Regions:
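Short N-terminal strand-loop motif that marks the start
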Residues: 1-69, 350-353
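Glycine-rich beta-strand-centered segment in the early N-terminal region that forms part
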Residues: 26-40, 53-101, 135, 140-142
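Mid-domain Rossmann-like dinucleotide-binding core that forms the NAD(H)/NADP(H) cofactor-binding site
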Residues: 143-226, 231
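C-terminal hydrophobic helical "lid"/dimerization subdomain
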Residues: 1-3, 184, 227-228, 235, ...
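NAD(P)H dinucleotide-binding glycine-rich loop of Rossmann-like/cofactor-binding domains
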Residues: 95-176, 204
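Glycine-rich phosphate-binding loop and adjacent beta-alpha segment
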Residues: 194, 199, 207, 219, ...
C-alpha cells in the first residue's frame, strides 16, 4: 500500500477552494477501522463548501465526503464484531464525547462535541478513511456499493420523516425542496402511508420535480416560480392546509411558507440548512398550535432500519443516481449537482464498482 493517496480537499474558506491533492494514508487507533472507500456520494453540503456557502465554518484543510461505503482494510486490536474484508457503511459522527446524557441515551447525533466526517474530521473522498468502529454497519452482499453510498441521506430522510415526524396513514404531506433529501423524504412519507404528497421547487428544479411525480409517486409538483405553494396547498382538500410540512430547503422563504401552509395542530419539520435570517413573525405558528420540529442526522437504530429498507428495495434510488464517476472527476460531478442538472453523483476512489 502506498503511503499517500489522492483526496478531494477543502483548504480555505473562499469560493472554489477545493482541489485534488496527495495526502497521507491515515493511521488508525485500537478502536478504529481503516476503510477502503468503494463509493462516496456527493452531498449538497459538499457543493456548498466548494462555493463557501455554508452557514458555519468547517475545519480547513479537510477531506470532503461523509456518505460512503467500502471494505474494511485494517482493524484496531480492540475492535469486535468486524473483520478485515467486511463490507460496511459508516455513520457520520466521526467524533463524539461518549459520556454526556445524549451519547449515553443513543442521541449521540446531538452531542454538543460531535464532529462530522468531511466537515470537522477528514472524510471519504479519498481511497482510505479512518472510521471509529462504533460508526460501522455491516452491509448485505446483495446491496451494491452504488446504492450503499446513499444510505446516509436515506437515514437523514428517514430520521426526519419517520422518527422526528410521525406521518399517519392518510396524512396530507408537503415536501419543500426536491433535492436528494426532499426526494427521499417523499418516499418515506409514502412508506408511512401518507395520502397525498406534494413537492415544491423552483424553475431550475424542473427535472427533479418530474422525477418526483413520474418515478417516485408524488401526487403533485409545484413550481414556486409560477404559482404560490401556500395557495396551492390551501386550495387542496378541506382548505386547512397540510398535516405535515417537511422543509428540506431551510431558507427563510420556505420556513415562512411552511408555517403558512401547515394546518392547525399540524407539524413543520425543518431538515434543510440555510444561512438567511428569519425576518418574519412566528406568531402564526402559535395561533395554529402547530409544532416546529428540527431534525438533524440519525442514529444507530435508524441506520439499521434504513439498511433493511434499501436492501429490500423500498427506496427507489436509481432515479436519483445520475452519475457514477472516478474521484478525479469530482469537479464535474459537483458542477452538475450545483446546476441541478443531476440529483446525486457517486464517486469511486478505488476504481469501478
Amino acid at each position: 500500500m502506498s503511503h499517500t493517496m489522492p483526496a478531494v480537499v477543502h483548504y480555505e474558506h473562499r469560493d472554489g477552494a477545493v482541489e485534488l491533492r496527495e495526502v497521507p494514508v491515515p493511521e488508525i487507533g485500537e478502536e478504529d477501522a481503516l476503510v477502503q472507500v468503494r463509493s462516496v456520494s456527493v452531498c449538497g453540503s459538499d457543493v456548498h463548501m466548494w462555493r463557501n456557502l455554508l452557514g458555519h465554518k468547517p475545519r480547513v484543510p479537510v477531506i470532503l465526503g461523509h456518505e460512503f461505503s467500502g471494505f474494511i482494510a485494517k482493524l484496531g486490536n480492540r475492535v469486535k464484531g468486524f473483520k478485515e474484508g467486511d463490507r460496511i457503511a459508516s455513520e457520520t459522527a466521526a467524533e463524539i464525547c461518549g459520556v454526556c446524557m445524549l451519547c449515553r441515551t443513543g442521541l449521540y447525533n446531538l452531542c454538543p462535541q460531535r464532529k462530522g466526517f468531511g466537515h470537522y474530521a477528514d472524510g471519504a473522498m479519498t481511497r482510505f478513511v479512518k472510521v471509529p468502529s462504533r460508526c460501522l454497519h455491516h452491509l448485505p452482499d446483495r446491496l451494491p456499493f452504488r446504492k450503499s453510498a446513499l444510505l446516509e441521506p436515506c437515514s437523514v430522510a428517514y430520521h426526519c420523516t419517520a422518527v422526528n415526524t410521525r406521518v399517519q396513514p392518510g396524512d396530507f404531506v408537503v415536501v419543500l425542496g426536491p433535492g436528494p433529501i426532499g426526494l427521499l423524504a417523499l418516499q418515506v412519507a409514502r412508506m408511512q402511508g401518507a395520502g397525498r404528497v406534494f413537492i415544491s421547487g423552483v424553475a431550475e428544479d424542473a427535472p427533479r420535480l418530474e422525477i418526483a411525480v413520474s418515478l417516485l409517486g408524488a401526487s403533485r409538483a409545484i413550481d414556486a416560480s409560477k404559482e404560490d405553494p401556500v395557495e396551492v396547498v390551501k386550495s387542496s382538500g378541506d382548505g386547512l392546509g397540510a398535516d405535515i410540512v417537511i422543509d428540506a430547503v431551510g431558507i427563510s422563504t420556505t420556513l415562512r411558507q411552511s408555517i403558512e401552509m401547515v394546518r392547525p395542530g399540524g407539524q413543520v419539520t425543518k431538515v434543510g440548512w440555510g444561512p438567511a435570517p428569519v425576518g418574519f413573525s412566528l406568531d402564526p405558528l402559535v395561533a395554529k398550535g402547530a409544532r416546529l420540529q428540527g431534525s438533524f442526522s440519525h442514529n444507530y437504530r435508524t441506520w439499521e432500519r434504513v439498511i433493511e429498507l434499501v436492501t429490500d428495495g423500498k427506496f427507489s434510488l436509481d432515479p436519483l443516481i445520475s452519475r457514477v464517476a472516478p474521484l478525479e472527476e469530482w469537479e464535474k460531478a459537483f458542477s452538475k449537482m450545483e446546476e441541478r442538472v443531476e440529483v446525486k453523483a457517486v464517486l469511486t476512489p478505488n476504481g469501478p464498482i
